[in-house]
Design a protein with these regions (language model features):
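Charge-rich, well-structured scaffold segments of protease-associated domains
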Residues: 1-6, 25, 36, 80-231, ...
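His/Glu-rich zincin catalytic helix
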Residues: 1-83, 188-294
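A short, hydrophobic C-terminal helix/tail in secreted or cell-surface proteins
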Residues: 326-330
């Protein structure tokens, strides 16, 4: 019987082999990276467009442009897209971050012809229907109002605004009225500027076959797609950090308190970034980290405390997050 009082030996990894992707330049100039690793007949396709919060002209423009891609195209409405993806056992993920928008498809290899047809329509010919947009905006407003009563949400907003300043895209806080300013025309403007072949890169992973690469090249790599083929210019933003070191956001009706501690830190391009990621993981990035073992296991102050690096462009944020009984922990 296993004696759980005996701690397992700590062993150093003997060898860590990281497979390198194959880099291909498609005929229309789109870079394609292929990581052929996997035994199951499944492929993941990622299309990245260099257009996120740092490039938008108004708050939420990048987010809703990406979010609305699946809500209707010239060939399929939202119900047809959802039904077809479900029928073929595929999964579509849409997300928007600081610098990039992501369109991700998981598909069984045997149904790639059908699922890639849907993916092509979503990327190349969205229509941003007004009715569906109105429903999604209303739902997001309700979620925003719910979140606005949560102490961890308010603490995070207070931290990034204090570190970056209200005019920096990292510290510019979304308000309820920003949702109401989103229209199909606003989304179409952002789509035309950033969703095109000269601003796109593609990544394939899983059990990638030659047929899959051929189909990707046929749909996204032979001819240019989009309307505005200018490469987006990178705009540099400079943080304006507040002089105050302690900021209090009062919520008299709140049942909990949240603490966020943070400082401007490294971005992904810094030579010490990966070392810092490992260090912060040991400090507070997983269940057995130092923060968790000290604050939760030893002192019993909370169920959860964590630390992380948020790698925003230019300067990231090193943050420690905690929500529960504030006074004893401090």
């Amino acid at each position: 019987m296993l004696n759980r009082s005996d701690q397992p030996r700590i062993l150093e990894p003997e060898q860590l082999a990281v497979q390198r992707p194959e880099r291909i330049k498609l005929p229309n100039g789109v870079p394609l990276s292929v990581l052929n690793a996997g035994d199951n007949e499944v492929t993941r396709i990622d299309l990245l467009m260099a257009g996120g919060r740092w490039q938008q002209k108004q708050p939420l423009q990048a987010l809703f442009t990406n979010r609305m891609l699946r809500e209707g195209t010239r060939r399929y409405d939202a119900a047809q897209i959802a039904e077809k993806l479900d029928y073929y056992g595929a999964w579509l993920e849409l997300s928007s971050a600081s610098e990039y928008a992501y369109v991700t498809l998981y598909s069984l290899n045997k149904y790639l012809p059908q699922t890639l047809d849907i993916l092509e329509s979503i990327v190349k010919e969205p229509v941003f229907p007004e009715k569906e947009l109105g429903v999604i905006v209303d739902n997001n407003i309700q979620q925003f109002l719910v979140n606005s009563s949560k102490v961890d949400f308010l603490a995070h907003r207070g931290l990034v605004k204090a570190l970056y300043g209200g005019q920096h895209p990292g510290g510019r806080l979304v308000q309820e009225e920003d949702y109401r300013r989103i229209t199909p025309a606003v989304l179409r403007e952002f789509y035309d500027r950033y969703y095109h072949s000269n601003n796109c890169s593609i990544y394939l992973s899983g059990k990638v076959t030659g047929d899959c690469i051929h189909r990707i090249e046929s749909l996204f790599g032979c001819e240019a797609f989009g309307t505005d083929f200018r490469k987006p210019e990178k705009t540099e933003f400079h943080p304006v950090t507040t002089s105050g070191k302690r900021i209090f956001i009062e919520r008299p009706d709140a049942l909990q308190s949240a603490v966020r501690m943070g400082m401007l830190s490294l971005d992904r391009n810094h030579p010490d970034y990966l070392k810092a990621r490992v260090l912060v993981t040991l400090f507070g990035g997983y269940f057995g980290s130092r923060l968790m073992s000290n604050i939760r296991e030893d002192k019993g102050y909370t169920y959860g405390i964590s630390a992380a690096i948020m790698p925003y462009p230019g300067q990231g944020v090193l943050a420690v997050s905690y929500t529960h009984l504030t006074l004893p922990t401090i």
